Amino acid sequence: MMVIPVSFKFKTMDDIEVTGKTVLVRVDINSPVDPNDGTILDDTRMRLHAETIRELSDRGARTVVMAHQSRPGKNDFTTLEQHARALSGILRRPVKYVEDIFGSAARENISGLGDGEIILLENVRFYSEEVLKRDPEEQAETHLVRKLAPLLDYFINDAFAAAHRSQPSLVGFALRVPSAAGRVMERELRTLQGALENVERPCVYVLGGVKVDDSIMVMKNVLENGSADLVLTTGLVANIFLAGCGVKIGKVNMDFIKSRGYCDFIKVAKKLKKRFPERIVVPVDVAVCRDGKRVDVPVKKIPNHPIQDIGMETIKLYARRIREARTLFANGPAGVFENPDFSIGTEDILNAISSSEGFSIIGGGHLAAAAVKMGFEDSINHISSGGGASISLLAGEELPAVRVLEESRHP
């Protein structure tokens, strides 16, 4: 499937002249970090955003990089000093770390930038207002935006993975400074919107993992608007639908659903399955952990043991439906893929997706990590860098960071 070009209502980097201009670029380089010494364990996101940063530098922009790492209270909530070093290595040019966000040191470093030079400001979430969720208009009035905006010629948002959040660094600058989308943001929106607007049939969604609220939100939207022909359920999502269908899934599995606060979704699942009986597919068997080993059982005979994967018969059924699809969206693993005994469902579904002739998209998060780990990265059309943002898009929700790019005024 060829994705038909999407026309954007916002500017991209192709539309602006950045030579000699001061450009603030918001990226999402939030990375796994060793809590003991702050060492970055995976630089995937930095390599992704390096494309945008390198292009700005090559075009002679005075580049100010803004990013976050984790959130307050987490053990990986660190400075961005290591990130600056890692970016310098990836870009093969200096990236100066500035231990300030919008104070005098930050402003002096911004004002002193030369053409092509790059600085990385401190973790923007060290600033308390950054973690408040408010309307973009309010975020444009924060100290962060009011202090830095006068020093900037352009704001570029490349943080697609955080585009569903309405925080000052993501939505505030676009209302005060001429703005554009970075290359990651542009590519993600072009692919996802293009696939959503030009669906080839049949269109199959594979929804699993443990974020049940996200999956049900997406499912409801794509079934009601008719864009999905079939939804295959896996993971905890499948367990909740099985319970909604009256299947006795065992006390240990019901207790897990309760522990996640998902009991109310059993009723929601029951109603959805009743409305779309042929279009929502649930497993016919599951794999449980019994005495530390994988045991496949029919759903009518689930013992009181943790469900860890979909069963082999379900895998065969799902793989056939996936291979028939012309458009595929998948989110969330089928089971506890970190355990080799229970990685079969996730791996076989990814294998079916990668060998399908349909256009395939994976919505970030754990399934994306599994796809890379299992070697399917190059055979899937698009692996999104933004789990939450891609889910919001598939659920028909507005992305605040994209809306303000559309509203940004240019001279």
Curated annotation (Swiss-Prot):
EC top class, as a word: transferase
Pathway linked to the protein: Carbohydrate degradation; glycolysis; pyruvate from D-glyceraldehyde 3-phosphate: step 2/5
Chief subcellular location: cytoplasm
GO MF annotation list: ADP binding; ATP binding; phosphoglycerate kinase activity
Positions contributing to substrate binding: D28, I29, N30, R45, H68, Q69, S70, R71, R125, R165
UniProt subcellular location: Cytoplasm
Stated family: Belongs to the phosphoglycerate kinase family.
Protein name (record): Phosphoglycerate kinase
Organism: Methanothermobacter thermautotrophicus (strain ATCC 29096 / DSM 1053 / JCM 10044 / NBRC 100330 / Delta H)
